[in-house]
C-alpha cells in the first residue's frame, strides 16, 4: 500500500506524463469544450484519478496485471482508497517502449473514461 499526504499533482501534467497520446488528445478536446462554457462544471464533477473532489489520504493496494496482449496492451486492476475503497481498472498501451494509461474504468464510467469523453465530444461539436 502506498500513502500520500501531499497535494494532488496537476492533472494535465500527470496525464501528459503517464497517459497515452490518444488519451491526451481527447482530454484537450474536452477542455476546449468546457472552456466554451465558463462557470459550468464541465464534463467532470470529480477527479477520476482520486475518485473524489478532495484529496484525503490516498492509497492503493491489490495492484495486479490481469492480462497482456501482444506485449502492446495490458489490463491492470487495483483498489484505490481515498476515504473509501474503489475498484479501478486501467487499460495500458505501450508507446515508444513505455507503458501508458489509455483508459480508466470506474463505477461511474463502466465503459471507461475515454468512452465518456468521446460521447461528450460527439454531443458538443
List each language-model region with its residue ranges.
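Acidic side chains
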Residues: 47, 102-103
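Low-complexity, intrinsically disordered terminal/linker segments enriched in charged
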Residues: 36-37, 67-89, 95-96, 103-125
Amino acid at each position: 500500500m502506498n500513502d500520500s499526504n501531499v497535494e494532488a499533482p496537476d492533472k494535465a501534467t500527470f496525464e501528459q506524463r503517464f497517459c497515452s497520446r490518444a488519451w491526451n488528445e481527447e482530454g484537450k478536446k474536452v477542455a476546449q469544450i468546457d472552456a466554451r462554457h465558463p462557470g459550468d462544471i464541465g464534463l467532470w464533477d470529480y477527479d477520476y484519478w482520486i475518485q473524489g473532489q478532495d484529496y484525503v489520504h490516498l492509497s492503493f493496494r491489490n495492484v495486479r496485471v490481469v492480462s497482456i496482449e501482444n506485449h502492446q496492451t495490458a489490463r491492470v486492476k487495483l483498489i484505490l482508497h481515498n476515504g473509501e475503497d474503489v475498484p479501478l481498472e486501467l487499460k495500458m498501451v505501450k508507446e515508444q517502449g513505455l507503458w501508458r494509461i489509455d483508459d480508466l474504468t470506474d463505477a461511474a464510467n463502466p465503459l471507461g473514461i475515454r468512452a465518456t469523453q468521446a460521447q461528450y465530444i460527439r454531443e458538443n461539436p
